[in-house]
């Protein structure tokens, strides 16, 4: 029987009135009355958890339904999740909004960054049976595609959510094809029907024409008001298949996510494909061959709720007592140690591939060690970030971080500042370039400093290649000319142009990834007055005429400001950089030259004139020879100072310049 002592439950869940979610216990009174009340609360909570466990234990696997929500950014995924949690009794109506958006940055930006999960129990009034529903609230932005794909692996179907005011958008299309390719059963839902700007017939027509789904099967709801949301739960039961699983087979579990808990360490979220996981069981990793003992097992309801076990078809969490957080590799398969002989790992394990790299340095050099720990904790919670230590002559010790996209980098920086109060300097984003040598070997370069310089022949380089992406854009047809010009100015190649219903156009372009990370989306929004949407996927490498541009101050290259770009951009970008960097440098007692160099050739230059003292101030106007002598001596001194002097550039100058560059 599943029973905790009241002290254990009180310490875990706290002294708040027992609703449906555990909460953290703060300081409470130790008076006899308060102690009795706390014991009552703990007992009630314990009884409630037991009742949940008993209900789940009675539900057969054929009544399990694992599903996700497919949607564009800001189409209402998290709000719809809240309504479903309310209808199934997981949270109370009127409780805090966006329960599954737990990060501050998610609430502030109105986006989902980390895929969150929750178990629900739905009693179908049509037959009186209980159904175990497992919801995954996935990110909608393209940068977090890795979160989406691994979440779909644990699902049998998905809700295809379309905003009635905006219609089908680029990320809806991209996520649809990802879900469709993984065999998910899709239920089309038209959201935000309560708004005056809602055009329901248009949205239904787009669903039918773009996705070939019957418009008559579209459910019309308002997640904000709860209108008609009740119709979604029976549709999930009827149309999404039960997971293909076997409780009696040896254990196979897929690692869906992991995060760091300050009290218990690494927590792993697993989809149990076959078998059962129980407390005390020893697990074996298929990819790292590490062995771990299950310290705790349970479900997300929506916070952690301990259980005796989780069975095939369920998604739950375990505390494995893992000492090295890097061993938690997303997509890994876990077996029961001792019963793993002859078993094959589940498909889908793939190391995340960063698309954008930045150098990161503490604003204060003395904070490196503390910030190193903070970054390590964040990387554990977001395994798609790659981390290497690096050193800059200008900024000192730092890290080279790899991200899935520019928004991903921005969100990581914001989380670091919000959650740890850390101040960090990020260099301009760069993409991974490929250097192909004459002997047939190749090398991926993510740091501009490592990019080959002027003499490629002496370095045995055959060709240089840069990554391209297939960009999908949906825009109103009135902006088609402006968007085509934008794409061509960013070295884009048109692949497809399709007119959708009601004045929308779907455009596909092949664009260099380097152009995409330079605020391409911001420019796209600007030229379409905010009505455009964008998604993209990797299109491989292509040969390109790319060069390294160095920013030099008095001949000294500033490694933190080195960039790689296409040769056609060198003149304009070089002039812009030297003019802007000049703004942040202080006057010196000698002349300072700021130069942009490519292959040791100066392509742009700005000069900061020397500060000079008026050495002739005390002279009589008629003393010409003395005047010339003093000016000549001053000029000679300036020459010597320029030859031996070094320009001190403080961190604030780099920070201000890079802030505007990014």
From Swiss-Prot:
Its EC number is 3.6.5.-. Its main location: mitochondrion. One of its GO terms (cellular component) is mitochondrial inner membrane. It catalyses: GTP + H2O = GDP + phosphate + H(+). It is a peripheral membrane protein. Keywords: GTP-binding, Hydrolase, Membrane, Mitochondrion, Mitochondrion inner membrane, Nucleotide-binding, Protein biosynthesis, Transit peptide. GO terms for biological process: positive regulation of translation; translation. GTP binds at residues 71-78, 137-141, 191-194. Residues 62-244 form the tr-type G domain. It is an enzyme of class 3 (hydrolase). It is found in: Mitochondrion inner membrane. The keyword Nucleotidyltransferase does not apply. GO terms for molecular function: GTP binding; GTPase activity; mitochondrial ribosome binding. SUPFAM superfamilies: EF-G C-terminal domain-like (SSF54980), P-loop containing nucleoside triphosphate hydrolases (SSF52540), Translation proteins (SSF50447). Gene3D superfamilies: 3.30.70.240, Elongation factor 4, C-terminal domain (3.30.70.2570), Elongation Factor G (Translational Gtpase), domain 3 (3.30.70.870), P-loop containing nucleotide triphosphate hydrolases (3.40.50.300), Translation factors (2.40.30.10). It holds the Pfam family LepA_C. Residues 1-28 form a transit peptide. Belongs to the TRAFAC class translation factor GTPase superfamily. Classic translation factor GTPase family. LepA subfamily. Promotes mitochondrial protein synthesis. May act as a fidelity factor of the translation reaction, by catalyzing a one-codon backward translocation of tRNAs on improperly translocated ribosomes. Binds to mitochondrial ribosomes in a GTP-dependent manner. NCBIfam families: lepA, small_GTP. This is Translation factor GUF1, mitochondrial. It comes from Meyerozyma guilliermondii (strain ATCC 6260 / CBS 566 / DSM 6381 / JCM 1539 / NBRC 10279 / NRRL Y-324) (Yeast).
